Swiss-Prot record:
Its EC number(s): 2.7.11.32, 2.7.4.27
Purpose of the protein: Bifunctional serine/threonine kinase and phosphorylase involved in the regulation of the pyruvate, phosphate dikinase (PPDK) by catalyzing its phosphorylation/dephosphorylation.
Enzyme's top EC category: transferase
Catalytic activity field: N(tele)-phospho-L-histidyl/L-threonyl-[pyruvate, phosphate dikinase] + ADP = N(tele)-phospho-L-histidyl/O-phospho-L-threonyl-[pyruvate, phosphate dikinase] + AMP + H(+); N(tele)-phospho-L-histidyl/O-phospho-L-threonyl-[pyruvate, phosphate dikinase] + phosphate + H(+) = N(tele)-phospho-L-histidyl/L-threonyl-[pyruvate, phosphate dikinase] + diphosphate
Name this polypeptide is given: Putative pyruvate, phosphate dikinase regulatory protein
InterPro entries: Kinase-pyrophosphorylase, PPDK_reg
Organism: Clostridium botulinum (strain Hall / ATCC 3502 / NCTC 13319 / Type A)
Family stated for the protein in its record: Belongs to the pyruvate, phosphate/water dikinase regulatory protein family. PDRP subfamily.
NCBIfam families: PRK05339.1
UniProt keyword annotations, A-Z: Kinase, Nucleotide-binding, Serine/threonine-protein kinase, Transferase
Classification of source organism: Bacteria, Bacillati, Bacillota, Clostridia, Eubacteriales
Length: 269
C-alpha cells in the first residue's frame, strides 16, 4: 500500500489534512501517517530511515523552519523519495509580493485552533452563567456585567464570548441579595450597565406586550418600579466603585468596545 507521510515541525494537522484530501482521491489504496515535531536533523534522518521503498511512499511537508525544510528536501533527493512542500512556495510567493521577510513560525494553525477553542470555552461560560444564580463563576470570569433586566447583559456576554472573553452577568434586583463574591474580585473586572429610565420603561413595555401580558402597568414595566430599580443599581455600583456604562440607544458593539478598552487597557484583545 502506498503511504503518504504528513510531516511537520508542529503538530502536523495542516499536513495531515492535505494528505487526507489527497489520499481520498485514490480510495483505500493510499494510507496517511502523521509525523509531527520534526525539528532537528536527527528527526529528519529518522524519518528517511523509515521509508524503505521510495516507490511506495511520499512526504507532504508543512515544515516552516528553513534549515530543517532544506535538509529534508536534500535527504529526500538523496534517497529518491518524492516530497511536496505545501507551505514553502506559498510563503515565498507572499514574501515576494509584500517584499517582506516571513517570520517562519511553526504551529500557526495550532495557534488559530487555540483561539477557536478559547471562543468555544468562553461561549459555554457565558451560557452557563447567564443571569447567574450560580456565583461560583465570578472569580473565574474575565468580565462581570451587572445591571437591571433589559440592559443588554446577555447579548454583551455572548458578543464578548465571541472574542474569547469569559463574561458573566448578574441581574440587580432590590429583592435579591448582591453576591458577596463581587466584593472579593478586582473592581476593574466589574462593569455596571445603566440606562435612561424612560427608554427602559419603553423596552420593558414592549417586552410585556410581546409576552401578551396586559396591562402594561404590570410591575415589571411600571415607571415607579423602574426608578426604584435604577436607584438600587446605582447604589450598588457606587459601592463597588466599578466603571458604569450608559447603554441607552447604544449598539452592542460600541458598548463591548468600551468594556474591552476599560478592562484590558493594558493589553490588546
Amino acid at each position: 500500500m502506498f503511504k503518504i507521510y504528513a510531516v511537520s515541525d508542529s503538530i502536523g494537522e495542516t499536513a495531515e489534512q492535505v494528505a487526507n484530501a489527497t489520499a481520498y482521491q485514490f480510495g483505500s489504496s493510499v494510507k496517511v501517517e502523521r509525523v509531527p515535531y520534526v525539528k532537528t536533523f536527527e528527526d529528519v534522518n529518522n524519518l528517511i530511515s523509515i521509508i524503505k521503498n521510495p516507490n511506495e511512499a511520499m512526504i507532504i511537508s508543512t515544515i516552516v523552519l528553513v534549515d530543517i525544510r532544506e535538509f529534508l528536501v536534500q535527504r529526500c533527493v538523496e534517497s529518491g523519495i518524492h516530497i511536496s512542500n505545501v507551505l514553502g512556495p506559498c510563503i515565498s510567493l507572499v514574501s515576494t509580493i509584500l517584499n517582506k521577510t516571513p517570520e517562519y513560525k511553526p504551529g500557526a494553525v495550532w495557534d488559530m485552533d487555540k483561539k477557536y477553542y478559547k471562543k468555544i470555552e468562553a461561549m459555554e461560560f457565558a451560557i452557563r452563567y447567564d443571569d447567574s444564580k450560580d456565583h461560583s463563576g465570578i472569580k473565574h470570569a474575565d468580565i462581570v456585567l451587572i445591571g437591571l433586566s433589559r440592559t443588554s447583559k446577555t447579548p454583551l456576554s455572548i458578543y464578548l464570548a465571541n472574542k474569547g472573553i469569559k463574561a458573566l452577568n448578574i441581574p440587580l434586583m432590590p429583592e435579591v441579595p448582591v453576591p458577596e463574591e463581587l466584593f472579593e474580585i478586582d473592581r476593574k473586572k466589574i462593569i455596571g450597565l445603566t440606562i435612561d429610565p424612560m427608554h427602559l420603561i419603553e423596552i420593558r413595555r414592549h417586552r410585556v406586550d410581546n409576552m401578551m401580558k396586559i396591562p402594561t402597568e404590570l410591575k415589571y414595566a411600571n415607571a415607579e418600579r423602574v426608578l426604584d430599580e435604577l436607584e438600587f443599581a446605582d447604589k450598588i455600583m457606587r459601592k463597588l466603585k466599578c466603571k458604569v456604562i450608559d447603554v441607552t440607544k447604544r449598539a452592542i458593539e460600541d458598548t463591548a468596545l468600551i468594556i474591552m478598552e476599560s478592562v484590558f487597557s493594558d493589553r490588546i484583545i
